[in-house]
């Protein structure tokens, strides 16, 4: 067998002659049948369409999530993001189409039942102001403050909840509507003067209403029935409110835990004045009474 080398051939000389390098470029050696090539092209197109469809669905879901995140009301809105004069009435609209509204989402219904939390900071500098009346802190419901009789200053019938200072005393009154009783009440005694006080109203396990003062569980009350929530607006300082300041009114659609409660107390009130100027120096906050008071009235 002889070998022939030239520019166009490589390999042994056979009866068929040398195998030219140029023959590797021939369609006979590298091209498939037309039907095979066409089938590959269809598979590629189908795979591409599937990939585009998957990307479109992912983009659509992401867009829907972003729109929901942007336009859905917060589950824990800050209704008063700052401090107001407690004699200054404020109405917080619940109609999402109203300018400046801050809608409140209905409570989370856990396995044990309905639950939610309200948090507010109060500073009272004069208990003799409107001493013959209930002094309104805030309530959620209708606009119907009683202006006569023994219950001047109380809203009726909706308090979901309502917070007031009672006449002739320095006591706090929490009112909660329930389905079986129009008005269930919890009293917190001896609200201090000239100090910031954190008041947290928490409903858990559907029937348990807790009131925390400066992070301390001060009263636990067993509601007779399920709390009755409403779609009314939130009203602050109606009928002249009280003498002092209100700060950082906030709602949570769940029963917040003790760690979250403590973080609210540690953060303190928001001292940014809304709608006016604060006179005098910064008041001290966190009355020590609530840290060292007796525990006899904690659950009664």
Give a label for each model feature.
Residues 1-300:
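Extracellular glycan-associated modules
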């Amino acid at each position: 067998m002889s070998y022939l080398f030239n520019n166009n051939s490589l390999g042994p000389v056979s009866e068929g002659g040398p195998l030219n390098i140029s023959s590797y470029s021939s369609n006979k050696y590298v091209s498939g049948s037309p039907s095979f090539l066409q089938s590959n092209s269809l598979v590629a197109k189908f795979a591409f369409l599937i990939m585009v469809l998957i990307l479109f669905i992912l983009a659509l879901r992401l867009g829907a999530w972003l729109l929901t995140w942007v336009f859905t009301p917060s589950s824990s809105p800050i209704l008063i993001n700052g401090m107001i004069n407690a004699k200054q009435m404020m109405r917080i609209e619940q109609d999402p189409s109203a300018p400046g509204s801050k809608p409140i989402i209905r409570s989370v219904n856990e396995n044990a039942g309905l639950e939610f939390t309200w948090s507010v900071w109060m500073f009272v500098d004069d208990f003799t102001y409107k001493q013959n009346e209930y002094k309104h802190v805030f309530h959620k419901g209708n606009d119907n403050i009683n202006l006569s009789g023994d219950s001047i200053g109380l809203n009726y019938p909706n308090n979901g909840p309502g917070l007031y200072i009672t006449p002739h005393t320095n006591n706090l009154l929490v009112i909660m509507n329930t389905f079986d009783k129009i008005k269930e009440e919890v009293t917190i005694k001896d609200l201090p003067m000239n100090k910031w006080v954190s008041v947290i109203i928490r409903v858990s396990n559907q029937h348990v209403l807790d009131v925390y003062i400066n992070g301390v569980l001060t009263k636990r009350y067993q509601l007779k029935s399920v709390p009755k929530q409403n779609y009314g607006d939130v009203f602050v300082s109606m009928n002249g409110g009280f003498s002092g300041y209100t700060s950082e009114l906030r709602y949570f659609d769940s029963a917040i835990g003790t760690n979250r409660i403590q973080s609210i107390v540690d953060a303190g009130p928001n001292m940014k004045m809304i709608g006016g100027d604060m006179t005098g120096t910064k008041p001290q906050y966190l009355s020590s009474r609530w840290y060292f008071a007796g525990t006899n009235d904690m659950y009664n």
